Amino acid sequence: MLCGLSKPTSGIGKVAGYDIFREAEQVKKHIGYMSQKFSLYEDLKVWENIRLFAGIYGMKEQDIERKTEELLDRLELTAERDTLVKSLPVGWKQKLAFSVSIFHEPRIVFLDEPTGGVDPATRRQFWELIYRAADQGITVFVTTHYMDEAEYCNRISIMVDGQIKALDTPARLKQQFGAETMDDVFQKLARGAVRKAD
């Protein structure tokens, strides 16, 4: 819903200043998205994926050229520019997918389980990319099941049974629930949930 792909049945929502009910196309123009499964085309080369997504977002040719080289250099993928994406290690794919999702400099980027299946060192590198994007003024919206990873965020929203049960900074949530970790906070909220019979 927040990405403008499906319409909500009720309520109010705005993303990047646009109403998700009436301005879904504007929402799509001002966001980036990285899915849980890779959002790259496996049978395209690294540089082809970058150019494809840049073109989809309507970037100018001279900007695409310049930024492609900068991105390849920053990710240390210059030597792999002509490599098919399916040949890259999982961590490299994740970093490339994230970088492509913000290539057009959106106001907000949605990351769906972005570090699933990668080793701890790659997770740390990935979060450095997230921090860099945030420093550039991009709002980063992360969904994760890794509560230790949630600690890296400025604000956390915890949903239980489709409803937001908590929303605050990690420190305040831990204080509010008398917990040492975000995992403890989540456990307390989940245990307190009333389950409906199937």
Question: Where do the PLM segments sit?
Answer:
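Conserved ABC transporter NBD signature motif
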Residues: 11-22, 26-27
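Catalytic Walker B motif of ABC-type/P-loop ATPase nucleotide-binding domains
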Residues: 109-113
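Conserved ABC ATPase "signature" region
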Residues: 51, 55, 62-80
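ABC ATPase "signature
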Residues: 167-168
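Conserved catalytic motifs of ABC-family nucleotide-binding domains
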Residues: 105
